[in-house]
Design a protein with these regions (language model features):
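Non-catalytic C-terminal accessory region of glycerolipid acyltransferases
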Residues: 1-98, 307-314
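Short catalytic/ligand-binding loop motif for oxyanion handling, primarily in non-cytosolic enzymes
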Residues: 14-18, 56-58, 182, 196, ...
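Short, histidine-centered active-site or binding-site loop motifs used for metal coordination
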Residues: 51-53, 130, 227-232
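Conserved N-terminal entry element of GNAT/NAT acetyltransferase domains
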Residues: 92-132
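Acyl-donor binding region in acyl/amide transferases
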Residues: 156, 193-314
Length: 314
């Protein structure tokens, strides 16, 4: 007919007796239907309506069986639902009251790091420093990390988010000259240097993944990225994140032997298990590197949770 199909999901199910009668004989289930409808009086039934499936999408299917499977999975995918964009209910550590460093103290320390400056853009400066040279800035980075991560239901629960890896990793950060504050930061691990001094256990990522022997030589040409954030005060701006990414390219100019960036990325538990399963499936199908994917194993592998949905059918 050339019209789109709209998937509609009703939350809930008929009684166990209804399904039992259906196993005895399909007609018994039909006889039971009026009662199943009447026993829903004064009950709230959630209804979710999905995006229309265009006729052009429908035409791509060559068999009714494949189309039916697709429609079935599109409908039951609505069973998982994002209720709001409020992450506060995920914060198990309570309200975070940041204890920032005095802006004048930060500004004074910034003045001593002119040799670490990579570039300037408007009122922003990008720096690349060692931990030992920026004690006050590192404290502020730890405060803003914790503040940012708590805002999305994560964080450490401590007053500042710093750890032992910070002490020998490098730090890329953006400074706002006008507001005298840290806008965002990245932690960078120069893998070759770290492995030489601390062994493979010196890499943060090694606490989450196990690298097989054939992968180790590639780490000598790799920078490990992590702990990135943009301060809450600047998250509505696009520029800070763009400047951090630009900073990564400037770092590459300082280390011409580097060929790879690696690093773990969090998927917030705010997303329902089905949504996380979709993300992982998509990344594996579309972006996995066959050369390297078999050389790194997660210590705690992701367990797909798709319920009644066949992720591969969508």
């Amino acid at each position: 007919s050339g019209v789109p199909i709209i998937p509609v999901y009703f939350d809930g199910q008929n009684s166990a007796l209804f399904h039992l009668m259906g196993k005895i004989h399909p007609l018994l289930r039909t006889v039971r239907l009026p009662h199943e409808l009447s026993n829903k009086k004064k009950k709230t039934v959630a209804l979710r309506i999905g995006h229309p499936i265009s006729f052009s999408e429908i035409e791509d299917f060559t068999t009714l069986q494949d189309l039916g499977a697709y429609l079935y999975n599109r409908t039951y995918a609505l069973e998982s639902h994002l209720y709001s964009h409020d992450f506060s209910n995920l914060n198990t550590y309570g309200e975070y009251v940041p204890k920032p460093v005095d802006p004048q103290v930060l500004a004074a320390e910034i003045e001593t790091r002119s040799s670490d400056k990579l570039f300037s853009a408007g009122s922003y400066d990008c720096f690349f420093s060692s931990y030992k040279d920026i004690p006050n800035i590192m404290h502020e980075i730890g405060v803003r990390r914790e503040e940012s991560f708590r805002n999305v239901g994560e964080g450490t629960g401590a007053e500042i988010d710093t750890d032992k890896f910070d002490t020998y990793y490098k730090h890329l950060y953006i400074w706002d000259r006008e507001k005298k504050g840290i806008v965002g930061a990245y932690r960078l691990g120069m893998c070759k240097e770290i492995i030489k001094q601390y062994g493979i256990d010196g890499l943060y990522s090694n606490s989450l993944f196990r690298y097989k022997a054939p992968f180790i030589p590639h780490l000598e040409k790799t920078i490990e990225l992590g702990r990135s954030f943009v301060a809450l005060s600047h998250q509505k701006e696009a520029l800070p994140l763009a400047l951090l990414i630009k900073g990564l390219f400037y770092v590459l100019l300082k280390y011409p032997d580097i060929k790879y960036f690696i690093g773990p990325v969090s998927i917030s538990s705010w997303y329902p298990p089905l949504y996380r399963t979709f993300m992982i499936y998509y990344l594996k199908q579309k972006h996995a590197d066959s050369k390297f994917s078999g050389l790194v194993d997660p210590i705690e592998p992701f367990e797909p949770q798709a319920g009644r949905v066949d992720v591969g059918a969508l």
